[in-house]
Amino acid sequence: MVNDPPVPALLWAQEMGHVMAGRARKLLLQFGVFFCTILLLLWVSVFLYGSFYYSYMPTVSHLSPVHFHYRTDCESSTSLLCSFPVANVTLAKGGRDRVLMYGQPYRVTLELELPESPVNQDLGMFLVTISCYTRGGRIISTSSRSVMLHYRSSLLQMLDTLVFSSLLLFGFAEQKQLLEVELYPEYRENSYVPTTGAIIEIHSKRIQMYGAYLRIHAHFTGLRYLLYNFPMTCAFVGVASNFTFLSVIVLFSYMQWVWGGIWPRQRLSLQVNIRNRKRSRKDIQRKVSAHQPGPQGQEESPQLSPVTEDGESHADPSGTEGQLSEEEKTEQQPLSGEEELEPEASDGSGSWEDAALLTEANLAASGSAPAPETVGSSEPSAGSVRQRPICSSS
């Protein structure tokens, strides 16, 4: 009973259990890789959108306090100042980062906090001037605006004091006015001449103020308007677009790695025809010797005997025409494992330069050589003039 073989059903169940466990581990691993890939793509998409938003969107609003200063070394009454109040404002964050972005229109305003004192009420209109400068203190833009306190009658001031008397007593309200002076409705930064600061001057020696602030607000249009007024919608669309684009890239990369590519590479075969220049040269020599007219075509001059077709001298009459040397026979036989060479052109176009040189040499040599009557005779015929080759010293 103990040594009985296991039931086939149990063996099948064990095998199926192992197979299912392996498949479960494989599926779990694939799910983990897929989940990590999705998280990575999502993080990269958010990072790309955040980088684009940070680099594309300028500073929406910039508020800088304005501290006026004036001269005090003159002899004047207590109600008058020695000079106009002047302030120098730096348009940079921390002295390094610029506030203004190139090509972006800005609305520049000056906020003045003035008390409703009899001096300010009797002041009337006064002038506010701003001068923007670049590196080196060179003025690049100037603007001036006139301003005055809002008029309120004595009866209205009395009623206002009675209504807000409790708040005025406990310090929750003050009798002051906040004037907003628009200096530039649309100020654009020049990329070649950047603005580094501004000088603000109030043309009044009797003015009294609590404080002043320079506000720079960006006026957005186009894509920046959408990014500023609909930030959540634009963020969702931007992250979704980046995620889709990255997912398509990863999907195509996976298909290229697994299936070998959607568009398989086509193998390009390049056939190179190798020409035997030595053989073509000998063929050209054979054709030149065959075209020589008269008895000159029966034998060649001694000067061309080393380069004739059959490779032997014509002084030996036993030489047979058409017999090739062992070297030419070896060259004519095709090499083992290589394709036969393509037949050359009948006109010897493969090496036309060599053909031209050999033709001139053969014609010159054949024209100067004597024409014997027979091939085997060594004596010249009657009436023929024997010529000797003359070597020029040149």
Swiss-Prot record:
Q: Please note every region of biased composition (Low complexity).
A: 292-303
Keywords annotated in UniProt? Endoplasmic reticulum, Glycoprotein, Lipid degradation, Lipid droplet, Lipid metabolism, Membrane, Phosphoprotein, Transmembrane, Transmembrane helix
Residue ranges of the TM segments: 28-48, 243-263
InterPro entries in the cross-refs: Seipin
Question: Mainly resides where?
Answer: endoplasmic reticulum
Record membrane topology: Multi-pass membrane protein
One Gene Ontology CC term in the entry? lipid droplet
Keyword Repressor (UniProt)? no
Modification type Phosphoserine: residues: S289, S346, S351
Record topological domains on the Cytoplasmic side: 1-27, 264-394
What residues are glycosylation sites in this protein?
A: N88, N242
Q: Name one Pfam family in it.
A: Seipin
Q: Give a yes or no for keyword NADP in this entry.
A: no
Region annotation Disordered: where it falls in the sequence: 281-394
Q: Which residues lie on this side of the membrane: Lumenal?
A: 49-242
Subcellular location(s) per record = Endoplasmic reticulum membrane; Lipid droplet
| Example GO biological process | lipid droplet formation
Describe its function: Plays a crucial role in the formation of lipid droplets (LDs) which are storage organelles at the center of lipid and energy homeostasis. In association with LDAF1, defines the sites of LD formation in the ER. Also required for growth and maturation of small nascent LDs into larger mature LDs. Mediates the formation and/or stabilization of endoplasmic reticulum-lipid droplets (ER-LD) contacts, facilitating protein and lipid delivery from the ER into growing LDs.
| Similarity field | Belongs to the seipin family.
The name this protein carries in UniProt is Seipin
The gene from which this protein is expressed is: BSCL2
